[in-house]
């Protein structure tokens, strides 16, 4: 039995609220259970130096947690003067995942920055950030299309992410903090709605696992991402 009482293949409740802020071209508050992340997409009419003059765009991401997003207060990384390795790893993952579904040539020479701020953490903050990031990106691109700034839709597919793990010997979907802390294997999958895999991260802690267990985790991830894709479509009216 999972601590939450959920079935092995049961997601936490998903909520996606769009238009959560007034200034960003795209914004959402996404919740996976008690994990809540504010995600904004900001359009900038510039690109990184390595892309200047090449006629194509870029999508990048930044990630951070509010000091009391967790059980005990954590210091702001800005106050420390540098980002942690974990933060850098997660924001690179978010950026890679979203770039996997964008045709940069159709975006034109502009950049979209996805900012992910964790308001409350109960496991799965990176997967919620990616899943909400796609919605914010979709909203921002829709504004570019509506204004005539771009002629063609650069988004090629939906992308979503979910965590899975082996808890007390059972593969389970969408780990919360308690499960994640006690799982002897955990994985994060980033999937496209066409079935392709953008990223797969799976690690063992204390005990290894076999190939069949990995495939069972992937099958669970497909179930979870299917639910997220449906929530994304509902949020964006597509």
Curated annotation (Swiss-Prot):
EC class (word):
transferase
Is the Protein transport keyword given for this protein?
no
Q: Which residues bind phosphate?
A: 86, 124-126
The answer to whether keyword Glycoprotein applies is no
Q: Which UniProt keywords apply?
A: Nucleotidyltransferase, RNA-binding, rRNA processing, Transferase, tRNA processing, tRNA-binding
Task: Read off the Pfam families from this record.
Answer: RNase_PH, RNase_PH_C
A single GO BP = rRNA processing
- Self-association state and partner proteins as the record states: Homohexameric ring arranged as a trimer of dimers.
* NCBIfam families in alphabetical order: RNasePH (TIGR01966)
Q: What is this protein called?
A: Ribonuclease PH
Its lineage reads: Bacteria, Pseudomonadati, Pseudomonadota, Alphaproteobacteria, Sphingomonadales
